[in-house]
Design a protein with these regions (language model features):
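Alpha/beta-hydrolase active-site loop signature
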Residues: 37, 63-67, 129
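Alpha/beta-hydrolase fold catalytic core
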Residues: 1-31, 52-56, 93-94
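Gly/Ala-rich beta-loop-alpha elbow adjacent to hydrolase catalytic centers
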Residues: 100-104, 108
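Conserved serine/cysteine hydrolase catalytic core
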Residues: 182-207
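Flexible "cap/lid" loop of the alpha/beta hydrolase fold
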Residues: 109-114, 120-152
Length: 207
């Protein structure tokens, strides 16, 4: 099961605290899907604000091969849709609202086209249902080329990445995925599989 965070009344619930769903009006639930190289945690501040007055429950999802999820050898929009439908069934979601950014926006659009019975309202940020030609190769190759054995801190990684990735805000966003595990830095996004799947992610699949 993919990982997710639940925000209600401005508070974070752990994933297994699901009993309150019985009382929740599903038309007031908003699922948030992050973009490429993102994670559910990126939306934490926004989710808290949106849920603060108690009128909406926000569920931010870590998509396949991102965030707190275990890595999988495959990555595509169809597989991400399967993950989300399994999550909906697990949470007993019948009809809900979706907010998707970038890759998550395409996922939300495809979900609404493929499984319209699940979607009440749709919000899309910073993406269109088209094939994109932008070259993500330099970004992902720069991340893959980083020798993590030489990295002692995020500052070390930032200095090396700055040679090829000039935009500091972009580097800070990407470096959120650099995690210290047992004294060694590791990527929290499955870069090798993402690179292999990039053509699929840049396209808008024909249904």
């Amino acid at each position: 099961m993919i990982k997710f965070n639940i925000f209600s009344n401005g508070q974070l619930f752990v994933s297994n605290e699901l009993n309150f769903f019985i009382q929740t009006n599903q038309s007031k639930i908003l699922f948030v899907f992050h973009g490429l190289y993102g994670r559910a945690r990126n939306w934490q501040s926004m989710a808290k604000k949106l849920s603060l007055d108690g009128s909406i429950v926000v569920i931010s999802v870590d998509l396949r091969n991102h965030g707190e999820n275990l890595f999988d050898k495959d990555h595509s929009y169809s597989l991400m849709m399967e993950d989300i439908i399994k999550l909906f069934n697990y949470l007993n979601i019948k009809k809900t609202n979706l907010l998707g950014h970038s890759m998550g926006g395409k996922l939300a659009m495809l979900l609404s086209l493929t499984y319209p019975e699940f979607v009440n309202k749709l919000i899309i940020a910073d993406i269109a249902p088209i094939d994109y030609q932008d070259d993500e190769g330099e970004i992902i190759n720069s991340l893959l080329d980083l020798d993590l054995n030489l990295i002692q801190s995020r500052n070390d990684a930032d200095k090396i990445l700055s040679i090829k990735i000039v935009d500091k805000s972009l580097r800070m966003f990407l470096l959120q995925n650099l995690q210290l595990v047992n004294g060694r830095y590791e990527w929290g996004v499955n870069l090798k599989v993402i690179k292999k799947s990039m053509n699929n992610l840049k396209s808008f699949p024909i249904l």
